[in-house]
Amino acid sequence: MVEMLPTAILLVLAVSVVAKDNATCDGPCGLRFRQNPQGGVRIVGGKAAQHGAWPWMVSLQIFTYNSHRYHTCGGSLLNSRWVLTAAHCFVGKNNVHDWRLVFGAKEITYGNNKPVKAPLQERYVEKIIIHEKYNSATEGNDIALVEITPPISCGRFIGPGCLPHFKAGLPRGSQSCWVAGWGYIEEKAPRPSSILMEARVDLIDLDLCNSTQWYNGRVQPTNVCAGYPVGKIDTCQGDSGGPLMCKDSKESAYVVVGITSWGVGCARAKRPGIYTATWPYLNWIASKIGSNALRMIQSATPPPPTTRPPPIRPPFSHPISAHLPWYFQPPPRPLPPRPPAAQPRPPPSPPPPPPPPASPLPPPPPPPPPTPSSTTKLPQGLSFAKRLQQLIEVLKGKTYSDGKNHYDMETTELPELTSTS
């Protein structure tokens, strides 16, 4: 006991020095000043986090006309002026005068209308920057930055979180990480939790998370999937915008690798939480807060690359309702049912009707009347008188001669006509 006392005193002094040197939020990032040795079991129905366990946790609260404040989303403090959160928190609520941000809190009062007390700090919103390509239908690029005023003072319970190094890549594998927030402790809770909750979650392979019986292709390459296949432990409504944090393998710092974005229900089997990965947006963050400010909050020792940069692909093409998953609500479009093993072939389409004729053809000319069959060929070139004489001779059964030709005529017996009188 005597030998351990100096060590404990040194730890307290070290934390005090870090807090003092970090008054301008320019000191080391991702340091947990206080930790629960047992750890919180889960956010949904779990245990409370220790005060100062996650010093970069921020409560984003709607500020009403009568000065009441209502917790809406979580966020991560990056430095004395900037907070990282989710873009969908500001849909329909992007007026800077409607927001107040609370720092260094373990417990918050829903609907509070009184100024916060130390060590808590409250700040106004100077600017809200939503990603230019944020898609509210698919929750693509669900990331935003909030500039606060006046700048925050870091200290015993307030400190900046870390962001991944450029060489880190997307978080993958069976790594255990943490989530925290003031969200609902059960899916149908009447309001968010007043106590900051924490939970340990596992990273889930994106291909498994996107499989047919899970999210069926709705998870994008810039997302991180975290939770458990059986559910039971998850983020919930009110945790949106809060951090997904993984411990650096070479340091004691925690890195914000994801932003709570969306999910179907809370803690359901095969419906884990979906987070916006921070690594693909490092350049975007640097363009807003400055490259030097970003370098200040990146891990000192870059880990070896784990994945290549994600390919750019168009947003998910399934039609989804424009209604947002507010407070981490389930996306309104239900998962499409799994198709049966064998789909019947569709019936053949009927043949198209024959095209109408261009124009009716004229009827063919009538065939010439048949010539009367006769074994007697009349001479050609005879005058009417001679032809008449020839006809008379034929009727009489005589032979006709025109002086040049001699013709034998067959006699045709005609029946005698009898009078009916």
Swiss-Prot record:
Glycans are attached at residues 22, 210. Residues 397-409 have a biased composition (Basic and acidic residues). The active site is at 88 (charge relay system), 142 (charge relay system), 240 (charge relay system). Its EC number is 3.4.21.10. Inhibited by SERPINA5. Heavy chain (catalytic) and a light chain linked by two disulfide bonds. Forms a heterodimer with SERPINA5. It is linked to Spermatogenic failure 87: An autosomal recessive male infertility disorder characterized by inability of mutant sperm to penetrate the zona pellucida, resulting in fertilization failure. This is Acrosin. It comes from Homo sapiens (Human).
